Regions:
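Charged, amphipathic alpha-helical linkers/stalks
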Residues: 152-170
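A general structural signal for short secondary-structure boundary/capping elements
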Residues: 48, 135-138, 179-184
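Metallo-beta-lactamase
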Residues: 42, 66-157
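Amphipathic, soluble alpha/beta structural segments
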Residues: 50-53, 57, 66, 128, ...
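Conserved N-terminal entry element of GNAT/NAT acetyltransferase domains
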Residues: 62-63
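C-terminal regulatory/interaction regions
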Residues: 164-222
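Active-site HxH/HxHxD metal-binding segment of metal-dependent hydrolases
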Residues: 1-58
Length: 222
């Protein structure tokens, strides 16, 4: 088992453990078509890491197969991507954004917009033929470049939209979250992210942009 040093710290925090257990527990009733006794419902427990990964580190899996570690904070502070250069495969997960079944790409910066966008552009500059996003889809060939271009545009557009909604709603994060949820989540068909996790993630993104606007306002007043 391997992860970043930040992930190791987070995993040992009681509040993080409680959140992981809660989100895992909430999703079990949403799983259909599988007998309940076949579902793994043991609560999450922290575990020891065998290796700490760092940005730029090269790990030889076997002869001729090396994985490069890329630190891409922004989605979460501990987030890592994995690039197999000789096979042009990138396992980017949420750091690249996530397209759903409708084709919409979600910008997933939960902790830092600028870091997320910088990481996204870093990934887009790599020579990639196979892109593995966090959920549902794998993109290949020319679809990879198209995905990255759309993901960058979606990220920048989301920030602009949230800034405008915050102005309209007088800075209320709760009202902005409710408006966005009504337009992009409530009308979406299944499968989709569990509602609790969606609201948690959306609130984090809107709150971050609200903080940026607040700091900008304070700076102008000085």
């Amino acid at each position: 088992m391997a992860a970043s040093s930040i992930a190791a710290q987070i995993m040992n925090r009681p509040n993080a453990q409680r959140l992981i257990r809660s989100l895992n527990h909430d999703v079990i009733p949403l799983v259909t078509g599988i007998e309940s006794d076949r579902l793994f419902d043991e609560p999450f427990e922290p575990f020891e890491l065998e290796m700490i990964l760092t940005d730029g580190q090269l790990i030889e899996i076997e002869k001729g197969l090396t994985v490069e570690i890329l630190a891409t904070p922004g989605h979460t502070r501990d987030f890592l991507c994995y690039y197999i250069q000789n096979k042009k495969i990138l396992i980017a997960s949420e750091a690249a954004g996530c397209a759903d079944g409708t084709g919409q790409i979600f910008a997933d910066f939960l902790v830092d917009y600028e870091d997320y966008l910088a990481g996204l552009k870093r990934l887009a500059a790599l020579d990639v033929e196979v892109l593995c996003q966090g959920h549902q889809f794998v993109f290949v060939g020319e679809a990879v470049k198209n995905f990255f271009a759309r993901s960058i545009e979606s990220t920048e557009r989301f920030r602009t939209m949230v800034e405008e909604l915050l102005r309209i709603e007088g800075g209320s994060v709760e009202r902005v979250v409710a408006r966005i949820k009504a337009e992009e989540y409530d009308v979406k068909p299944f499968p989709k992210q569990p509602e609790k996790a969606y609201i948690l993630n959306l609130s984090a993104r809107v709150s971050y942009i609200a903080q940026i606007l607040y700091e900008r306002t304070i700076t102008r007043r000085r």
